[in-house]
A protein has these predicted regions:
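Residues at secondary-structure transition points
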Residues: 1-13, 68-76, 100, 104, ...
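N-terminal glycine-rich phosphate-binding loop and ensuing alpha1 helix
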Residues: 1-40
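Alpha-helical elements of Rossmann-like donor-binding domains used by nucleotide-donor carbohydrate transfer enzymes
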Residues: 17, 21, 76-80, 108, ...
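Residues at the starts of beta-strands that form the adenosine-phosphate
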Residues: 31-34, 89-90, 163
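Short phosphate-binding loop-to-helix
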Residues: 42-90
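Conserved beta-loop-beta/alpha segment of the NTase-like Rossmann-fold superfamily
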Residues: 71-138
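A generic structural signal for short hydrophobic patches within well-formed alpha-helices
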Residues: 106, 140-144, 183-184
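Conserved alpha/beta core of the MobA/IspD/sugar-nucleotide pyrophosphorylase nucleotidyltransferase superfamily
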Residues: 146-204
């Protein structure tokens, strides 16, 4: 099956858009670490190549974890990420197919969660519509590790929704994930206040 995360958006794989923004944000916050959980060796190789190409002295706050069971459902990616995070104080789960999610929203979401969601979960919203990413303090780790099949962190989030902290994004489009693309399609992404057109190509 084709891997949508490797679709090229103007010569850049789709997963790289949010990935690159996360790296920039984490580089500004030395206490934050980014863990890439993937079942795809191609993505692991690309991330490692980026790490090797980083300028000497530049912090590349990324750890890569291959999760061979992720094809069984989202729960296995969640569990692999938590195990790799060790004694982290909290977990923030981002998905790689949200190329519209901005750098400003990444940083704003994480900073708000650190301030206001130390003991409760959180997620992003737009006009009352909830979406990814989702945040959990470490005390929810046991429940997250009990997830099975295609149940992601949102299943645990719903149990505690009345206590949750929410972060409002600026644009509805930021919450869109890309579940299907034709072989060539035009997409529009707003970056730094400027709307850009991207041509999307499938890697054969």
């Amino acid at each position: 099956a084709e891997n949508k995360l490797l679709y090229l958006l103007d010569e850049k794989p789709m997963f790289r858009y949010l990935f690159d923004r996360l790296v920039k944000v984490c580089q500004r916050h030395p206490e934050w670490e980014m863990i890439v959980v993937t079942q795809y060796p191609e993505i692991e190789h690309q991330v490692k190549a980026l790490q090797e190409n980083e300028q000497q002295g530049e912090r590349f706050p990324v750890k890569t974890v291959i999760s061979k069971d992720s094809y069984k459902g989202a729960a296995y990616s969640v569990k692999a990420g938590i195990r790799a995070a060790g004694d982290a104080d909290a977990y923030a789960f981002f998905v790689a197919d949200q190329p519209y999610f901005t750098e400003e929203s990444v940083e704003g979401f994480l900073e708000k969660m650190e301030r206001e969601a130390k003991v409760v979960p959180g997620c992003v919203t737009w006009n009352g519509q909830e979406g990814n990413p989702v945040w959990f303090p470490a005390k929810y780790g046991k429940e997250l590790l009990e997830l099975e099949g295609d149940a992601g962190g949102r299943k645990v989030f719903r149990r505690y929704r009345e206590k949750a902290v929410f972060y409002e994004v600026s644009l509805e489009k930021e919450l869109e994930d890309i579940d299907y693309m034709p072989e060539i399609e035009k997409m529009r992404i707003t970056e730094g206040g400027t709307e850009k057109t991207f041509h999307v190509y499938v890697i054969e």
